[in-house]
Amino acid sequence: LGTYPLYAKQLTDVLVMAYEEGYRLIDTADNYYNEKDLGESLYYIYNQLGAKREDFFLVSKVSDELYPIGDYRAGSNRGVYFWKSSRIMQSPNAVREILEEKIDNTLRFLKTDYLDLWLMHWPYPDFFLEIWHEMEKIYAAGKVKAIGVCNCRVRHLKALRDQGLSIPMVNQFESSPLNTKEEIIDY
């Protein structure tokens, strides 16, 4: 169940209906800004419907926080973090510190001590390899059971392989009759 753009009572109501219909995979992202509400909704379901944490497969994504430059509809957003021009990224440990903070916030907001799947929301060009390497470390530490990527093309997966990094366990991407993504599926 995708949770964007659901918040507060609407999110709880949808989640209760979805749970009663058998939904168990819940998908969110830190830049949907609904992880706290989702945690409260899950807490409600645990207490009111007798569900357990283990009943759900929780997915979240590590994302950049965007701020608009000019007309956002023209695709002129720029990220706060994962750009070389960002002042935040000048520290040599910036990627590690940001990812550790993001996963810890996600776990706290969702009221859980682990995530079933953590995805990199986009292949951020300036820090793609570094982000993935830090995600591998967080996976090894046991905070997440699986790691993956979103919206990656073959060239991104080859870059990981060529650097000796692990291949993502999941690559979430859009596919439809009009947008078949045959190359990535074949890969």
Which residues fall in each region the model found?
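Short helix-capping segments at alpha-helix termini
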Residues: Y44-E54, L110-T112, I138-K143, Q163-I167
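Beta/alpha (TIM)-barrel catalytic core signal, keyed to glycine-rich beta->alpha loops juxtaposed to Asp/Glu
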Residues: A8-K9, D104, M120-Y187
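Active-site mouth loops of central-metabolism enzymes
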Residues: G2-K9, D64, Y81-E97, D126
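Glycine-rich, positively charged active-site loop/lid region within alpha/beta enzyme cores that binds
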Residues: G70-Q90, L178-Y187
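Short, well-ordered amphipathic alpha-helices
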Residues: K36-N47, I103-L107, M135, L157
